[in-house]
Amino acid sequence: MAKRGKKYVEAAKLVDRAAAYSATEAVELVKKTNTAKFDATVEAAFRLGVDPKKADQQIRGAVVLPHGTGKVQRVLVFAKGEKAKEAEAAGADFVGDADYIGKIQQGWFDFDVVVATPDMMGEVGKLGRVLGPKGLMPNPKTGTVTFDVTKAVNEIKAGKVEYRVDKAGNIHVPIGKVSFEDAKLVENFRTIADTLQKVKPAAAKGTYMKNVTVASTMGPGVRVDVSTLA
């Protein structure tokens, strides 16, 4: 395990590891314990009582955070004809078809989110091995395979984030930047928590939200009292 820096160690002393803080207190602590010299991302981590190995307990989707993430997302849209024009009008950063497939195969990744119209998926599917491991493959569950490219681009630009449970039952989601007002971070935090409650698999048994923490990019994790996220 990497040795922690002096600033991190000092910051960690401010956090009572045995305590579960309210969402508001946790956000305040995350700001106090942020050691980065840049506008660090604030990330929430949810440990869920699900078995991701079972198909009926997979959790994946997307939600628009009311105050965005503070990051400007570069959107690539695979579309043709009128749909390509719609994507450009909506503010997509890159719009095209086969030409971008070739660029990506050659190692171009100057984008953060990929959207594709359903008729393009036969071609985009060729990029599965490249985009899949990076979490960039378009998917109907996250609204990134759609003919409504205007809505897709608008939502992404407005602060839509994707969530997906990993093999250990965890979900990590950015909820903003340390420069955000506390109230905005808390509202974003509650929005994602509420969304995860709504998509709880019927097959999930026992406690669903087992543990929730929040932290800045280079700061210590702060445990959150789940009841304060309701």
From Swiss-Prot:
Binds directly to 23S rRNA. The L1 stalk is quite mobile in the ribosome, and is involved in E site tRNA release. NCBIfam families: rplA_bact (TIGR01169). This is Large ribosomal subunit protein uL1. SUPFAM superfamilies: Ribosomal protein L1 (SSF56808). One of its GO terms (biological process) is regulation of translation. One of its GO terms (molecular function) is rRNA binding. The keyword rRNA-binding applies.
